[in-house]
């Protein structure tokens, strides 16, 4: 995983481990996630591993009629982090407007990340709503309305106070040492020294709220939203004699891009959600599933390429274009539902580290995905609602079928998602802050297990 992404995710874990603060994934996009910036949510977002947003080139102020702008933003405080990528934290000392985190190893001792939070003051937002309406003929606004896209406004941003060079030395992701990985050809990818310079004012994390657009160019950014709310709600018919406000002349319908899993965040809901998406993938022809597995196998371990594929599918769906998978004897045309399902699983896979993606390739080759899936599923099923850390016994038969090499791969795969498996016992250490990581791993394993199982069956039939 890129150092910048390591930093932003670690920052969110420290500041807001179970809240709605979203880490920024791309350093190059930081200027487009400042307060008042407009962003779009990815098509297949889910609460189970967090919603993700993509930049636009506009701010809310760009869409409003000319007028005065808020003079400043509210500064919610300053925070200082030392050795932030360390896995184990020795102590946490709080003083007014300052938080210092001391760790054990990982970053160079000179690296201290100082951040501040900037947010839109409620009073400034209310004044803006009263004084400036939306510009009715703005091309971007009309384009989003035509495509029925939901727009979100960045309401709070965490930014770097000073330029800092963050150096990651050794393995800052794993929660235990894995010297045996060198024998598996993975040690180089896990222990590279990397560094990134974060400029002053760089946004590292942010919070968003939904923009609502009404008749007569009125707008709002409600504090509380539900999954049926849209930026451009449909207008309902009312009697001519009736007096009704612009905000009442709407008919809310569930949005197509709603946040999956928004109502009940438990393992049963996650499992049902994953099953719905795998059922759509199962509808592909045997050749289509085999082709999808081949394509993913080539991309696993190349996170940038996976993200590029995700953007390609998103763009095709937005433009109503058809997408095909390259396969023999002929290409396979993907339906809209199939593309939606593939986007869901791509979202899960891109949450994993590059190291995990490479381990998945090895696991595919060794045909141990069913064991790994069962391990993650069993752990989530037992602990999903567990809010306290703890060490719990592991069913001995879960890993009994694995040899030494397969066991090392499995320990590394789940360990990089924050689940520490201890052979003595056997037992595992549960940390509720890693739940989202394990949910993404569960979804990714579910897809690859389905595709490899179907592919093996196809191969067997062909040989029979």
Swiss-Prot record:
Free-text disruption phenotype from the record:
No visible phenotype. A number of gain-of-function mutations, such as alopecia and excoriation (AE), bareskin (Bsk), defolliculated (Dfl), finnegan (Fgn) reduced coat 2 (Rco2), Rex-denuded (Re-den) and recombination induced mutation 3 (Rim3), have been identified: they cause progressive hair loss (alopecia) accompanied with hyperkeratosis and chronic skin inflammation. Gain-of-function mutations cause bulge stem cell depletion, leading to skin inflammation and alopecia.
Identify the InterPro entries for this entry: Gasdermin (IPR007677), Gasdermin_pore (IPR040460), Gasdermin_PUB (IPR041263)
Q: In the UniProt annotation, what is the result of changing residue 344 to H? A: In AE mutant; gain-of-function mutation; causes an alopecia phenotype; constitutively active in triggering cell death. Mice also display hypoplastic mammary glands, impairing lactation function
Q: What Pfam families does its record include?
A: Gasdermin (PF04598), Gasdermin_C (PF17708)
- Gene Ontology cellular-component terms listed: cytosol; mitochondrial membrane; nucleus; plasma membrane
GO MF entries: wide pore channel activity
Keyword field contains Ligase: no
Q: Spell out the family assignment given in the record's similarity comment.
A: Belongs to the gasdermin family.
What effect is documented for mutating residue 348 to D? Spontaneous pyroptosis-inducing activity
Q: What is the effect of changing residue 343 to P?
A: In Rco2 mutant; gain-of-function mutation; causes an alopecia phenotype. Attenuates intramolecular interaction between the N- and C-terminal domains, hence may relieve autoinhibition; constitutively active in triggering pyroptosis
The effect of residue 344 to C is: In Bsk mutant; gain-of-function mutation; causes an alopecia phenotype. Attenuates intramolecular interaction between the N- and C-terminal domains, hence may relieve autoinhibition; constitutively active in triggering pyroptosis
Instruction: Give the keywords, sorted.
Output: Cell membrane, Coiled coil, Cytoplasm, Developmental protein, Lipoprotein, Membrane, Mitochondrion, Necrosis, Palmitate, Transmembrane, Transmembrane beta strand
| Record note on what altering residue 344 to D does | Spontaneous pyroptosis-inducing activity
The protein in question is named Gasdermin-A3
Tell me what the record says results from residue 132 to A.
Weak or no effect on ability to induce pyroptosis. Impaired ability to induce pyroptosis
One of the GO BP terms on file: avascular cornea development in camera-type eye
Effect caused by changing residue 145 to A: Impaired ability to induce pyroptosis
Q: Which residues form a coiled coil?
A: 255-327
Instruction: Please outline how this chain is modified post-translation.
Output: Cleavage relieves autoinhibition by releasing the N-terminal moiety (Gasdermin-A3, N-terminal) that initiates pyroptosis. In contrast to Gsdma, not cleaved by bacterial effector protein SpeB. Palmitoylated.
**Biotechnology and industry use:** Pyroptosis-induced inflammation mediated by Gsdma3 triggers robust anti-tumor immunity and may be used in therapies to suppress tumor growth. Use of a nanoparticle-mediated delivery system that selectively directs release of N-terminal moiety (Gasdermin-A3, N-terminal) into tumor cells, triggers pyroptosis and robust anti-tumor immunity. Pyroptosis of less than 15% of tumor cells is sufficient to clear the entire tumor in a mammary tumor graft.
Tissues showing expression: Highest levels in skin with weak expression in placenta and testis. Not detected in the gastrointestinal tract. In skin, expressed in postnatal hair follicles and epidermis as well as sebaceous gland basal cells.
Extract the ranges annotated as region (Triggers pyroptosis). Answer: 1-261
Q: Which gene encodes it?
A: Gsdma3
Q: Where does a cardiolipin bind?
A: 9-13
Let me see what the UniProt entry remarks about domains.
Intramolecular interactions between N- and C-terminal domains are important for autoinhibition in the absence of activation signal. The intrinsic pyroptosis-inducing activity is carried by the N-terminal domain.
